[in-house]
């Protein structure tokens, strides 16, 4: 027999939706937008690391 806990009682409403699928696209477009923004963020970080993005007055030294 499973033991009841306060955390389990708080999380039970989330688990009650398990297996239910909302018809249509749902939040897929929103996920696509956030994936695109994350890609832009990663590209900016990569350009700073490669020093191909020049920032005025900002020097980057990777040596120890």
Curated annotation (Swiss-Prot):
Protein name: Photosystem II reaction center protein H
NCBIfam families: PRK02624.1 (NF002728)
Gene3D superfamilies associated with the record: Photosystem II reaction center protein H
Family the UniProt entry places it in: Belongs to the PsbH family.
GO MF assignments: phosphate ion binding
Originating organism: Rippkaea orientalis (strain PCC 8801 / RF-1) (Cyanothece sp. (strain PCC 8801))
HAMAP family, A to Z: PSII_PsbH
The keyword Transmembrane belongs to this UniProt entry's keyword annotation: yes
GO biological process: photosynthesis; protein stabilization
Annotated function: One of the components of the core complex of photosystem II (PSII), required for its stability and/or assembly. PSII is a light-driven water:plastoquinone oxidoreductase that uses light energy to abstract electrons from H(2)O, generating O(2) and a proton gradient subsequently used for ATP formation. It consists of a core antenna complex that captures photons, and an electron transfer chain that converts photonic excitation into a charge separation.
Residues that span the membrane, as ranges: 29-49
Keyword terms: Membrane, Photosynthesis, Photosystem II, Thylakoid, Transmembrane, Transmembrane helix
A Pfam family reported for this protein in Swiss-Prot or TrEMBL: PsbH
Membrane topology term: Single-pass membrane protein
Subunit composition and interactions: PSII is composed of 1 copy each of membrane proteins PsbA, PsbB, PsbC, PsbD, PsbE, PsbF, PsbH, PsbI, PsbJ, PsbK, PsbL, PsbM, PsbT, PsbX, PsbY, PsbZ, Psb30/Ycf12, peripheral proteins PsbO, CyanoQ (PsbQ), PsbU, PsbV and a large number of cofactors. It forms dimeric complexes.
Any GO CC annotation of this UniProt entry: photosystem II
Gene giving rise to this polypeptide: psbH
Subcellular location, record wording: Cellular thylakoid membrane
Domain of life according to the entry: Bacteria
